Amino acid sequence: MARIAGVNIPDNKHAVISLTYVYGIGRTTAKQICAATGIAEDTKIGTLSEEQMDAIRAEVGKHTVEGDLRREINMNIKRLMDLGCYRGLRHRRGLPLRGQRTKTNARTRKGPRKPIKK
């Protein structure tokens, strides 16, 4: 197994599919990385040379991935909450942010039902 951005990448899968194991790299970004490094998308990771793997690592290094991306997302949410804007308040209360109804639905964001105590 090859390691890219601190993640074990499966050797027996195509390059595009294997790159999606890295948090922050989807199919489109993986295709762009393959095109930039000159590697065919259907090439298996196990057959790549060390120079090609270094090229992929360098290209992935240009993107925000894994821990840095998670930290950036959390900091953006924290910033919204500190500002006290509408989206920040919705985050703070654990409710949907984008205008969905909450009278009957939104169970995913709100969590399980709480019984009414009498």
UniProtKB/Swiss-Prot annotation:
InterPro entries: Rbsml_uS13_C, Ribosomal_uS13, Ribosomal_uS13-like_H2TH, Ribosomal_uS13_bac-type, Ribosomal_uS13_CS
GO molecular function terms listed in the Swiss-Prot or TrEMBL record: rRNA binding; structural constituent of ribosome; tRNA binding
One Gene Ontology cellular component: cytosol
Region feature (Disordered): 94-118
PROSITE patterns, sorted: RIBOSOMAL_S13_1, RIBOSOMAL_S13_2
GO biological process assignments: translation
UniProt keyword annotation of RNA-binding present: yes
Membrane-traversing stretches: none
Short name of any one Pfam family annotated for the protein: Ribosomal_S13
Keyword annotations of the record: Ribonucleoprotein, Ribosomal protein, RNA-binding, rRNA-binding, tRNA-binding
Family: Belongs to the universal ribosomal protein uS13 family.
Function: Located at the top of the head of the 30S subunit, it contacts several helices of the 16S rRNA. In the 70S ribosome it contacts the 23S rRNA (bridge B1a) and protein L5 of the 50S subunit (bridge B1b), connecting the 2 subunits; these bridges are implicated in subunit movement. Contacts the tRNAs in the A and P-sites.
Official protein name in the record: Small ribosomal subunit protein uS13
Biological source species: Cellvibrio japonicus (strain Ueda107) (Pseudomonas fluorescens subsp. cellulosa)
